[in-house]
Amino acid sequence: MDRKLLDRIRECPTLPSLPAVALKVLELTQSAEFDLTDVARLLSKDPALSSKILRTVNSSFYGNGHTVSTISQALVLLGSQAVRTLVIGFSLGSNLSKNKSGSFDRATYWRRAVYAATASRLICERMHLIQTETCFLAALLMDIGMLAMDQVLGEEYGAITARALSHGDLPAIEAQTLGLTHAQVAGMLAQQWKFPLALQVPMEHHHEPQEVKDSLPRQLTEIVALAGRCADVFVDKGPMWALADARRMALELLKIDEAGCDQLLKEVGQRTAELAPLFEVKIDPHTNYDTVIREANEKLLQISKEGAQETHQHERRRAPRIKKESDVFILPCLGGVVRQSVKVRLMDVSARGIGFTAEKPMEKGDQFIFQTKKADGTPMTLLYETVRCDKNAKGILSIGAELVCVLNDGKKPAPKLHAAGTAEKISKAVMN
């Protein structure tokens, strides 16, 4: 971690801070003996904030069924944790919107924030957890480090975010270029604002929940991580990987199949359309889950066709394999339909192929997508074709696959396998 850059961000005079009202509400609601009357009296001193809370409690997102006209009624109906969430969310949202730069796509940032917040609420409801408001706020604010880094670095950070094809690619690019990620900055800000640990931990570790050891914080972080991937399904320009990851993570966390995940994502899209106006966030009214999944499947079908063409155009050559063991994820290409991503154990790699072990068999000729990182942290997406699937002496499935082609990243044509330097670039990426 680059401590100098972190200190530079921490000491930035234009970095947004929590207003006095929000700080006091946070302090009051963390006390075991606080009085709702004190919170109501405090909020009444900020008419704009009170108005937003009343508008929210009367919205279809909360669906109370009757009109609430006073802050006291809203507090009783919503509860202290929900009010805390709204006060902090509205306060920071308002402050952060005041500082705008031309280098950073803040509209996409806020769209992702409200999609993730909605998803976290729905996930908590399915898990019957009482930490719904905590997860909602953590998901809403988990990427706040991006805004802080943009405030300090300006055009430099805008160029970094532009290199990420998906939000999931961003931490590797940030770490490689800056020595610091937006998640680490979010953790620093959460600590500086004296957020409870239940908020701090998910905000800091939402890209690496496996690093959290304690069970409850780990569970909350996994919820926020899944919520973020659900948001990427709607926000990423190419949602294929986000969709595959969301399905895999939903199966692991919620024990739901693809149909159950599809229902969750459809509801995320519908409910976010209700939440977004409350935070003054504009979302495309034509963006719905049915459209997203159709586009993702069309992209996968296109990839399969490109792979078939490339297979006939290049001569396969053997390349030296290097032993390399690590857990990775692949995306099977099955009939042009996006499925969940699958974790496999990478065993060896070369410029022309990979070997791995898996729990489920693959047929000869089956294709899959594997994404690795270049030296600068940006992704390289590769299409492979299975050439063998055998059981070893221990009964473990050992699978070998040959590289078919490098896939287009959507910004420039993909290099051909027979082009000069391509094999070397692939070797560096997969062996990194």
Per-region residue spans from a language model:
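N-terminal helix initiation/capping motif
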Residues: M1-D2, T14-L18, A273-V349, E402-V406, ...
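Extended Gly/Ser/Thr-rich low-complexity repeat segments
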Residues: G365-A375, K411-E424
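Conserved alpha-helical "signature site"
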Residues: M1-W241
